[in-house]
UniProtKB/Swiss-Prot annotation:
Present with 2610 molecules/cell in log phase SD medium. Residues 307-349 form a coiled coil. It comes from Saccharomyces cerevisiae (strain ATCC 204508 / S288c) (Baker's yeast). Residues 96-105 are annotated as: Polyphosphoinositide (PIP2)-binding. This is Actin cytoskeleton-regulatory complex protein END3. The gene is END3. Residues 236-248 have a biased composition (Basic and acidic residues). Component of the PAN1 actin cytoskeleton-regulatory complex composed of at least END3, PAN1, and SLA1. Interacts with SCD5, SLA2 and YAP1802. Interacts directly with PAN1; the interaction with PAN1 is prevented by PAN1 phosphorylation by PKR1. Gene3D superfamilies: EF-hand. GO terms for molecular function: actin binding; calcium ion binding; protein-macromolecule adaptor activity. InterPro entries: EF-hand-dom_pair (IPR011992), EF_Hand_1_Ca_BS (IPR018247), EF_hand_dom (IPR002048), EH_dom (IPR000261), End3 (IPR025604). It comes from the Eukaryota.
Length: 349
């Protein structure tokens, strides 16, 4: 690693001055654009910052800034393959020699007092404060039209918040909470993605090889498909509807009674299916169903398109009726839950 040259120091001074230091120091937020533009892994940047911040005040004076910049450039230009555990003597400013010695002594004492490291496991429970924090991150992310978020969007956002996680950590947790290898994930898996990485960053928790069964069900659930050309097999509801249509075509008026009983049976099954959902899950599902309903309606009105010619109008009508029914059931369920909540709040007060 070549030693510092005078022209380098002048270049670093120009950069340092451009960051508008306060009391001859710059903080992490001021240096963050430089760190981010280096494209180095966040764990590497975190180690560089630790080495450069010799007095541990979370700010860099010019001498410390020079150390930070030199290590970054050496990593980017591949002059070194990894960040050293300790600063080389030629990179330590004369005014900081005593501070370096004190830091080494503190580290030795701390290591001597530390008990053997135990493996920290991820705790999947999320407190209300955790949920509020993850909700803010989720809302700040750019989403696709179906409300899901891509890996690139999430990893870019979290790399600016968690400095102790690597790209490998991001990829491992993404594979963990996205077992179907989907291009994007919805709200619940996103929360677990953030929650796991946060514990990895803050506590050094080990990334598990698999999810608990209850979480695996959440992360394995299929997203609602909006593709009318999908090759999914016909549902039982559609088969029953076709049987009713055949009876009607043959002049058997009793089909209306059969259809009515099917609707009641279908409504009961929908209520049972959604009875265990939370208010947030109900609201999210309602939003998806309404989106699909609007999409189907627009497709039905565009009868002149090539796609609509290939679609059975009767099956579209069945889909519209079924979706409207599910939306109505969900609305009733959500209203009942709200009334229950109001009643509980009234009892507490």
């Amino acid at each position: 690693m070549p030693k510092l040259e005078q022209f380098e120091i002048k270049k670093y001074w120009q950069i340092f001055s451009g960051l508008k230091p306060i009391e001859n120091k710059v903080n992490h937020d001021q240096v963050l654009p430089i760190l981010y533009n280096s494209k180095l892994d966040s764990s590497v940047l975190n180690k560089i910052w630790f080495l450069a911040d010799i007095d541990d005040d979370d700010n860099l004076d010019f001498e410390e800034f020079v150390i930070c910049m030199r290590l970054i450039f050496d990593m980017v230009n591949k002059n070194i393959s990894s960040v050293p555990d300790e600063l080389p003597d030629w990179l330590i400013p004369g005014s900081k020699v005593n501070l370096i010695k004190e830091r080494k002594k503190r580290k030795q004492i701390e290591n001597a007092d530390l008990p053997p490291k135990k493996e920290i496991k991820v705790d999947w429970y999320m407190s209300p404060d955790d949920l509020n924090q993850y909700e803010k991150i989720y809302n700040s992310c750019a989403k696709l039209t179906d409300g899901t978020i891509t890996f690139n969007e999430l990893s870019t956002k979290l790399s600016t918040k968690f400095f102790n996680i690597s790209k490998t950590d991001l990829n491992k947790v993404w594979s963990l909470i996205n077992p179907q290898n989907l291009p994007s994930i919805d709200r619940d898996p996103t929360f677990y993605f953030i929650h796991c990485l946060r514990q990895r960053n803050d506590l050094g928790a080990e990334i598990p090889a698999s999810l608990p069964n209850s979480l695996a069900e959440v992360c394995n659930k299929k997203q609602l498909s909006y593709d009318l050309r999908s090759s999914q097999p016909p549902t039982k509801r559609k088969e029953e509807a076709n049987e009713v249509d055949n009876l009607r075509d043959n002049g058997q008026n009793s089909s209306s009674d059969s259809s009515g009983s099917n609707v009641l049976s279908n409504e009961d099954s929908i209520k049972q299916k959604y009875a265990s959902l939370t208010d947030d899950q109900v609201a999210n599902m309602r939003e998806q169903l309404e989106g699909l309903l609007n999409y189907k309606k627009s497709e039905k009105t565009q009868g002149g398109s090539k796609l609509s010619k290939r679609i059975n109008i009767r099956s579209i009508t069945d889909d519209l009726d079924n979706i409207e029914q599910q939306v109505e059931v969900l609305e009733n369920y959500l209203n009942n839950k709200r009334h229950e909540l109001q009643a509980l709040q009234a009892e507490i007060n």
